[in-house]
Amino acid sequence: MKRSKTLRAADAKVDREKLYAPLEAVRLAKETSTTKFDATVEVAFRLGVDPRKADQMVRGTVNL
């Protein structure tokens, strides 16, 4: 499937080998967005905890 000019330009801005800082990643996500509505971004963190143990449960939300 052929990709549009907009998607190719957005893909060229992202270096897939680089680890981005959180602020830079959010800026890049907003800059390369092709939608005309507020999109959702999911972030996953590896915390190294055992979710089966009640004292190690981690939950929360963040507003950007």
Swiss-Prot record:
<comment type="function">
    <text>Binds directly to 23S rRNA. The L1 stalk is quite mobile in the ribosome, and is involved in E site tRNA release.</text>
</comment>
<dbReference type="GO" id="GO:0006417">
    <property type="term" value="P:regulation of translation"/>
</dbReference>
<comment type="function">
    <text>Protein L1 is also a translational repressor protein, it controls the translation of the L11 operon by binding to its mRNA.</text>
</comment>
<keyword id="KW-0810">Translation regulation</keyword>
<dbReference type="InterPro" id="IPR023674">
    <property type="entry name" value="Ribosomal_uL1-like"/>
</dbReference>
<keyword id="KW-0687">Ribonucleoprotein</keyword>
<dbReference type="GO" id="GO:1990904">
    <property type="term" value="C:ribonucleoprotein complex"/>
</dbReference>
<dbReference type="GO" id="GO:0005840">
    <property type="term" value="C:ribosome"/>
</dbReference>
<keyword id="KW-0678">Repressor</keyword>
<protein>
    <recommendedName>
        <fullName>Large ribosomal subunit protein uL1</fullName>
    </recommendedName>
</protein>
<dbReference type="GO" id="GO:0000049">
    <property type="term" value="F:tRNA binding"/>
</dbReference>
<dbReference type="GO" id="GO:0019843">
    <property type="term" value="F:rRNA binding"/>
</dbReference>
<keyword id="KW-0820">tRNA-binding</keyword>
<comment type="subunit">
    <text>Part of the 50S ribosomal subunit.</text>
</comment>
<keyword id="KW-0694">RNA-binding</keyword>
<keyword id="KW-0689">Ribosomal protein</keyword>
<keyword id="KW-0699">rRNA-binding</keyword>
<comment type="similarity">
    <text>Belongs to the universal ribosomal protein uL1 family.</text>
</comment>
